[in-house]
Amino acid sequence: MSAAPLVGYSSSGSEDESEDGMRTRPGDGSHRRGQSPLPRQRFPVPDSVLNMFPGTEEGPEDDSTKHGGRVRTFPHERGNWATHVYVPYEAKEEFLDLLDVLLPHAQTYVPRLVRMKVFHLSLSQSVVLRHHWILPFVQALKARMTSFHRFFFTANQVKIYTNQEKTRTFIGLEVTSGHAQFLDLVSEVDRVMEEFNLTTFYQDPSFHLSLAWCVGDARLQLEGQCLQELQAIVDGFEDAEVLLRVHTEQVRCKSGNKFFSMPLK
């Protein structure tokens, strides 16, 4: 069974709360009516120069060999930045201990499974922003997050997911308490998406924390007996009830190689 699709991102990039001062909104013209911009001759910039500035509006490279053979759900184009809104999860040692038991067991069914490098719960689909939209988009998000309080949630139900194209499969822990708070967050994120004419989140989403992934559709191998055994491991793990109860303190937006944090009250 396919549940809410998830788009994975690498952990590359650095925390960056600063941006340039461009305030252009989607749909704004590049010059005022009645003004005719003077034509300018533009010469191509050598690759050796472009490579010196990875944070420019050209966006990150699209090289599938750098992220395990994953294929983009949309083609990379110059000036387009893949953008994703989510709740980050900082994995503690005990959580990684649980994963050290779960993953090898799942790999007996699907050997190509690999552990996620970073952990999060998605609040949006992956969308494309033009470079000059990033700052206004983040400002709009921050404005809508200011009224939200921190909350606890529990994610202890093992579930199998695929992305929309069925090109990747994920093992995740589904949220079993705190679902209403996540829906409230998504509602506000969706409002921002609508302001920028971007795709909103899925109807009836299954909020979850992805643990491992593989290329291809591996639901047949992972659902059924394997899923039952993985759930038994979680249920029997020492202090699992406490371990899988998580305090949500912030929402984060990743756009290209830039990260923006929005603390909750």
Curated annotation (Swiss-Prot):
Effect on the protein upon substituting residue 122 to C: Significantly decreases exonuclease activity
InterPro entries: Usb1
Keyword Nucleus appears in the UniProt entry: yes
Residues annotated as binding UMP: 164, 202, 206-210
pH-dependence annotation: Optimum pH is 7.5.
Primary enzyme class: lyase
Matches recorded under Pfam families: HVSL
Transmembrane intervals: none
GO cellular component annotations of the record: intercellular bridge; nucleoplasm; nucleus
Effect on the protein of changing residue 210 to C: Significantly decreases exonuclease activity
Phenotypic consequence of residue 120 to A: Abolishes exoribonuclease activity. Does not restore U6 snRNA processing when expressed in deleted mpn1 yeast cells. Increases the accumulation of unspliced pre-mRNAs when expressed in deleted mpn1 yeast cells
EC number(s) given by UniProt: 4.6.1.-
Biased composition (Basic and acidic residues): 20-31
Record text on activity regulation: 3'-5' RNA exonuclease activity is inhibited by a 3' phosphate terminated RNA.
Catalysed reaction equations from the record: a 3'-end uridylyl-uridine-RNA = a 3'-end 2',3'-cyclophospho-uridine-RNA + uridine; a 3'-end uridylyl-adenosine-RNA = a 3'-end 2',3'-cyclophospho-uridine-RNA + adenosine
Family of this protein: Belongs to the 2H phosphoesterase superfamily. USB1 family.
Subunit and partners: Interacts with PLRG1, CDC5L and PRPF19.
UniProt name for this protein: U6 snRNA phosphodiesterase 1
Source species: Homo sapiens (Human)
